[in-house]
Amino acid sequence: MSDYSFSPTGEKFLLPEQDDYSKEFERLKELVNRQRALGREIVLVMGIGFVGAVMAAVVADAQDGKGNPTKFVIGMQRPSTRSFWKIPLINRGLSPISTEDPEVALMIERCVNKKKTLTATFTYDALKLADVVIVDVQCDYLKESLGNVRSGQTEMKALEESFEIIAQNISP
């Protein structure tokens, strides 16, 4: 039985199957080779939620003094039923988040469809291609009492798992 991820608008996306991973890594290697030939640094943003999607767009929009792009960004999201849908949306040039700042959606569209400096993926093998890794995963702070930020705890499971994935996929 196949698993699906549903966007907030109800669009249905089939989760990747085992043979999709090698195809996806080949797609990324081709993109990265072209971007390196243009002299661009490869940046991987791990997590493309509210913070990560904006970070990926801002970095992908970076340019030198002559207006030339300097970075190629791979936004990486785990392929879960809860969040996989963000990947195909970004790859269409659509923002996976709602924000009051209209520039975010414009920047994502520009970087994906015009500048070609942003893509999204589900494969952790993408880490092997990165020059720089930015980790933007959810770390909730659970307050025990209002007005006292010193009493509470941070839920760091996603961050710890991210570090394990990074360690398994990059060389020192």
Task: Map each language-model feature to its residues.
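Structural/interface elements that position substrates and couple domains in central-metabolism enzymes
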Residues: 1-172
